C-alpha cells in the first residue's frame, strides 16, 4: 500500500484475482493522504484481499469479488438508520466493519449468510479464506 500526497482519486487498488500466492505481484494499492480518515485505506486494502463493492455499486468492481460472497453490504439498523460496510458506496453511514453476517451493528447483521442461490455478503469471511495467499503477497 502506498500513501500519496494528492491526486484525482481518494484511492485505487488491484482486486485479488485468485486465492493463490502467484498473484503477489498485483497486491498493490494507493490512497491519498487527504482520504485516510474516510476509511479509504481499509477499502483499498480490501480490494487487495479479494473484496468487492456492494452489488450494483459499480466503480470498476462490478462483477463481484474473489468469491461470490466477497461483496460489501448496505443495511438498515433497528434505529431506522441506513448503514454501509467498508466496501459499500453511499448511501448510508459507513461503519468500520467489512460485511459479516456474524457481526451486528445497531441490532442488525452487517452481512448476509448464504442461502439458496444467494451467495450472501461476507467480505470478512473472504478475508479469512485468503489468509495464506495474502501472506505471500505482503512481504516486508
Question: What does each model-identified segment do?
Answer:
Residues 1-140:
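Extracellular (secreted or membrane-anchored) zinc-dependent metallopeptidases
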